[in-house]
Amino acid sequence: VLFVGMLMLCFMLYLDLFRKDYYQRKGSLSLLFTLIVFYSVITAFMVTHNIFNVYIIPYAMLPIIIRVFLDSRTAFLTHVITILICSISLRFPHEFILTQLAAGLVAIFSLRELSQRSQLFRTALLVILTYAAIYFAFELMTENGLSTDFSKLNIRMYTYFIINGILLLFTYPLLFLLEKTFGFTSNVT
């Protein structure tokens, strides 16, 4: 509880220092906190009830949504705060944090503005490749060492990354719902 409180305090401090205008628009704050709470609850639920694997959850959707409606810096910081909160309930938080941060950065950098669906396909593909590359590096460091025995690779994880990328494609229709719910306008509509 203390860890989550400190992270949220840091996030609020960032908003107060650099994004005071978000306090004027209630939709901005509502969107940010709704996304943080949503991803944290989903992660805790999946870990507690041992449902699938958390790598199926499209965490990169969070910075994409915030990037489209707000800005890149806020998208990155919100993503970092959410990933750190979600990592509390995991068995291997270090691997999770590095993988998700890399995927989130790729999602932010590959998507300047979302005006066509093809941009989201490209972003989803880049996110999948990032997940796979980071996880492959982890596997080389931990499981295989420097050997080239690829039969020891955990193929299931790569399947989770592909499912994650497919779920990431649902960002586009979700943006319409979020626009109506929180009162935003974007280039998507």
Where are these regions (language model features)?
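Generic detector of multi-pass transmembrane helix bundles and their immediately adjacent loops
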Residues: D16-K26, V37-T189
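Selective detector of the "anchor" transmembrane alpha-helix that sits immediately C-terminal
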Residues: L2-F18
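Loop-to-helix transition at the N-terminal end of transmembrane alpha-helices
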Residues: S28-T34
